[in-house]
Amino acid sequence: MSHPNPRPRRIRALCAAIGLLAIAGCNVVPPAQEDATRYFVLSGAELPALAAVQAPTGTLRIGVKTVRLESYLNRKEMVVRTGANEVRFEDYRRWADPLDAAVTRIVRSRLLAAPPVAQVFAEPFPFDQARDFDVSIDIVRFEGALGADGKYSASLAAVVEVSTTGAGSRIVSRKLFEAPAQAWDGEDFNRLAQLLRADVDLLAQEVASDIPEKP
């Protein structure tokens, strides 16, 4: 008397068990988590008011070189200085725009509003346009900072240089600009972005005041 071969049944049972495990595995895959990263800009939510178009009253032609950042600032993560030689990079708090471009844009806009100025060019400069002065800005601090008193503040410092152009160019002025410390709570990064924007506005005003009224 022949006995049925049990192997096919075992194989079918094994396949069924594997299938059940696969289905169960699909049900226990954790749901995708929301990205916790937040992005910030230096510009506010309000749109700039459009003023009536007027012919410029000034004659100066200014070139704004691309803003340079200390290497540790040249990144998307916002920076918090926690000691004299220690910084913390905020992986989930980032700048939406490159900082050099954002600061250049604000400074250029402020210079265009200065009465002695007729035109402002951003680097790379057009070959067919002469310039009276060039402005260079090296940012050495652009961060939240923890002070020795345990309190946080916004910190911006930059070296600003104004020079003439052409073959015989010379430096007209060179100074270290430090924005007044503004209190920050160390947690609200939207507020830190607002404070640093206010500091950039002060920097832009300083640059405008450094431009001589005549070439």
Can you say where each PLM-predicted feature lies in the sequence?
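Surface-exposed short loop/turn segments
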Residues: V29-A49, A114-G166
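C-terminal motif of bacterial Sec signal peptides marking the signal peptidase cleavage site
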Residues: A22-G25
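Envelope-exposed proteins and targeting segments
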Residues: G58-L60, N74-K76, G83-N85, D91, ...
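A structural "domain/chain start" motif
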Residues: N27-A101, E213-P215
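Extracytoplasmic/secreted envelope proteins and their assembly/folding machinery
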Residues: D100, T104-R108, R197-V200, A204, ...
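Short secondary-structure boundary motifs at beta->alpha junctions and helix caps
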Residues: V87-R94, G166-E206
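Bacterial N-terminal signal peptides that target proteins for export
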Residues: S2-C15
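Sec-exported extracytoplasmic/periplasmic mature domains
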Residues: R108, L112-P116, G144, A208-P215
